[in-house]
Amino acid sequence: MAQKIRFTKMHGCGNDYIYVNTMEQSVPNPQEAAIRWSDRHKGIGSDGLVLIGKSPVPEADFSMRIFNADGSEAMMCGNASRCIGKYLYEKTHPWPLPVKEGNGYQETEIRLLTLSGVKILYLHIVDGVVERVTVDMGEPVLENESQFLGNRVLDKGTFVSMGNPHYVIFTDDVDQVGETGRALERHPAFPQRCNIEFAQIVSGKTTDKTKADHATIRTRVWERGSGITEACGTGACATAVAAALTGKAGRKSDIVMDGGVLSIEWRKADNHVYMTGPAEFVFDGEIEI
């Protein structure tokens, strides 16, 4: 008899994944499953597969593994982490972690173990429903650009790692992502491949003497292993950091992606990047393996 896997499809700003609770069941070959299930014509259709599990270390409450549509394993996904927060809170009864009372809302924290470390999720809850999630994405890692100097292709952008590598190009034509994203992802300068963002400052532009408190940045993404996606949480964070580093914006930005808006703050106090955005259920289902 064929084994059936229960799954939930969710999305964060259109960045959709298949979520499987491995505390209740197992996926024997997640790489192969990600390829087959992500197919939008012959499978469920998604940008990849996310496995939710128990944390093997005491520093975290739960764990996440994420596989791209091509079967490769990703270090981190901001949109998926928000969806996991909503999934866990709304599908776990009783809720095992402390809940704080706010003015008309509740808040709870989840420590989520990823391949790029433990991330803290702050869930904003109204009437038992998670309305939005803020994720402490940690400190950005600024790549050493000396190896790229003199390269006509790679001297126009900014390199930022948010647990996975991003190359951000500011341009007046964000639709270039469809033409050049694939080539840049696999450029020889990126032996592990790279996520590519094309970004345009829409409002809150700065001068040399001042930086806007809050910028709006239109961004399109080519995700490593998945291609063009509706949104990318770590890509939004990388874009906001790159804008601040290059003097195009201050430390707060709204990143407008194809699938929605993410609010990003790069705080001076701890040098951490905080991402806030929605998470939505699409449907539950079962699939044979």
Tell what function each PLM region has.
Residues 1-129, 168-289:
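A glycine-rich beta-to-alpha transition motif near the start of alpha/beta enzyme domains, typified by
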Residues 118, 139-140:
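Short, charged beta-turn/beta-strand-edge "cap" motif at the junction between a beta-strand
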Residues 129-137:
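Short, solvent-exposed secondary-structure boundary/capping segments
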Residues 140-144, 149-153, 158-160, 272-289:
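C-terminal domain-closing interface element
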